[in-house]
């Protein structure tokens, strides 16, 4: 088997070393081979071999998100795309770039920044993420407030289907031709429908200036009012991030002397005249809403601050018994959900909840990183997580778990109960992957 793939891929592009196999394990399942293709044709040949030999495939980049998703059933081979790391085409004048999936986000930004352009994606753990992995998980960060998510930034892609067919979804222009945009189908599908082999992104000019206003409050109630006031104004904000005191203390290197129970950060990008007006109005609004402390960060310090936030990985391999939950809520529920989570944490002596929220986008990340291990049994831990999910559900929100111990990674625990549209998802999965080549179990409902 190894000889066959070495002939196809090359001698240093097939691995069965125990150390590397463990690196690409998922939920305790360890592959027997790691394959490192460098072309679309090689991916197609691997698909044919998997179908012929009845093998189950896992698609990965750097496998930095190995703890994301529910437990898989079986795993034979892993395809790592981190050596498909070329920039295929860059049309600078049209603000478009076509890349291979193994290009990392820092590598791409460094290349684009030379021409005063950038890709506005800043997901958690960005320094280790490949673009293919970011698109496959549809992960985003604070910049989604102004620029949107992968679904807004991806113009098209090439995908290798389970039957080895190569398709082109979407296009290379911002205004695509009429028809179904199949690229949206593969974004966020966790590699369960096909192998993303090339991606075309829409780019943006690098902002001339950026400044960040950081305000602290002792009471949370003023913060939703501040966010609503800024949202109702004509002020253009690129990022709006809420952090509670526990998050600041546990995960930030520096609080810059800004003491307080609740922290809100607003980032503004643009030209000097617009920036001056916007920052002054934001400062005034923050004071009117009772801010305890306010500090302004210039471009250099602002960039450093946001890079620190997006580079956080929070949980490493030493703390994989902890949970990272992500919550999406209706606009009107932001304040009440945060208050409910804070009350749940304050009334429970066995856990401490760190909260980071993309406040303008109504996405809340909750980190349960301080379980009292002596008193918190696995069953009780699961019960607490389900209580948190019920709090969210009661306010018309949804919660998924990004990281959990292997004992808690069945689909219902990670994703919650499948929605009304699950039967459509199941039909799509069956239609695209008739022979179940891609590992089953990691996605919603065990897909």
Task: Give residue ranges: language-model regions.
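Short, ordered loop/turn segments at secondary-structure junctions
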Residues: 62-64, 124, 245, 404
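C-terminal substrate-binding/cap subdomain adjacent to the FAD-binding core in PCMH-type
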Residues: 136, 155-316
């Amino acid at each position: 088997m190894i000889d066959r793939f070495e002939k196809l891929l090359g001698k240093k592009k097939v691995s069965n070393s125990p150390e590397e196999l463990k690196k690409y394990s998922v939920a305790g399942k360890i592959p027997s081979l790691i394959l490192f293709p460098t072309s679309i044709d090689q991916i197609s040949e691997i698909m044919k071999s998997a179908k012929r030999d009845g093998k189950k495939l896992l698609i990965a980049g750097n496998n930095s998100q190995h703890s994301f998703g529910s437990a898989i059933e079986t795993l034979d081979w892993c395809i790592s795309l981190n050596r498909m790391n070329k920039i295929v085409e860059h049309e600078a004048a049209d603000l478009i770039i076509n890349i291979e999936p193994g290009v990392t986000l820092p590598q791409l930004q460094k290349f684009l920044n030379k021409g005063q352009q950038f890709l506005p994606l800043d997901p958690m753990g960005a320094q280790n993420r490949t673009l293919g992995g970011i698109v496959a998980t549809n992960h985003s960060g604070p910049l989604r407030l102004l620029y949107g998510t992968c679904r807004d930034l991806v113009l098209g892609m090439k995908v290798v289907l389970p039957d080895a067919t190569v398709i082109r979804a979407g296009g290379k222009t911002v205004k695509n031709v009429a028809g179904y945009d199949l690229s949206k189908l593969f974004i966020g599908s966790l590699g369960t429908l096909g192998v993303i082999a090339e991606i075309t992104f829409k780019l943006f000019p690098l902002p001339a200036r950026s400044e960040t206003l950081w305000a602290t409050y002792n009471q949370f109630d003023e913060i939703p009012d501040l966010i609503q006031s800024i949202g109702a104004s004509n002020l253009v904000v690129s990022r709006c991030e809420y952090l509670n005191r526990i998050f600041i203390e546990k995960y930030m290197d520096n609080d810059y002397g800004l003491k307080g129970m609740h922290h809100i950060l607003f980032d503004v990008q643009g030209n000097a005249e617009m920036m001056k007006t916007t920052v002054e109005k934001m400062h005034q609004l923050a004071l009117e809403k009772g801010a305890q402390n306010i500090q302004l960060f210039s471009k250099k310090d602002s960039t450093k601050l946001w890079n620190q936030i997006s580079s956080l990985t929070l949980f490493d391999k030493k703390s994989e018994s902890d949970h990272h939950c992500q919550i999406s809520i209706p606009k009107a529920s932001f304040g009440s959900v945060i208050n409910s989570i804070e009350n749940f944490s304050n009334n429970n002596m066995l856990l401490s909840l760190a909260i980071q929220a993309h406040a303008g986008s109504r996405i809340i990340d909750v980190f349960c990183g301080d379980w009292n291990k002596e008193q918190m049994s696995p069953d009780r831990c699961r019960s607490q997580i389900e209580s948190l999910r019920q709090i969210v559900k009661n306010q018309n929100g949804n919660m998924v778990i990004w990281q959990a111990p292997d004992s808690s990674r069945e689909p219902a625990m990670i994703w919650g109960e499948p929605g009304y549209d699950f039967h459509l998802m199941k039909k799509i999965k069956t239609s695209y992957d008739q022979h179940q080549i891609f590992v089953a179990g990691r996605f919603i409902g065990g897909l």
